[in-house]
């Protein structure tokens, strides 16, 4: 058990480092989106379109479910799968995208159709894999085959506390970008390419 503890603490440290390495990019991207929306609040884009005219039962909802590849993670996988199952039952007009062996086995055993299985090991995420996954999902959204896209995953708050999250990825909500107007807003320059 001491060896298992050392291995798990090593994996936790590695995961924390990977998270801290990607957070600056994520927060900078959010900041830039906020900046763009400050200057062009009425921007129209397919990525902000909400399809409010469509009845909720007619909306095609995509769910990206992220689980582990192995089952030695306590409630980590159980809670994600439980919430995913609830969402799928609530929205029968859905498409399911699964990352992780446990998720694949769970849905296959229950006869739930998986739109796309991404056969990447979730223990070793890469930018290239993330790009491949996002390109496929975005293409379905752009074609109108998906009206909304959600991601269901477990967020590690600290070493002993985790929380299952469900977040809407598409369409983007302008309110999600904290659009605070800085003091020097009038002097702030913005160059967009291609221009809107």
Label each region the model flagged.
Residues 1-196:
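C-terminal beta-strand-loop-alpha-helix "lid" module of Rossmann-like NAD(P)-dependent dehydrogenases
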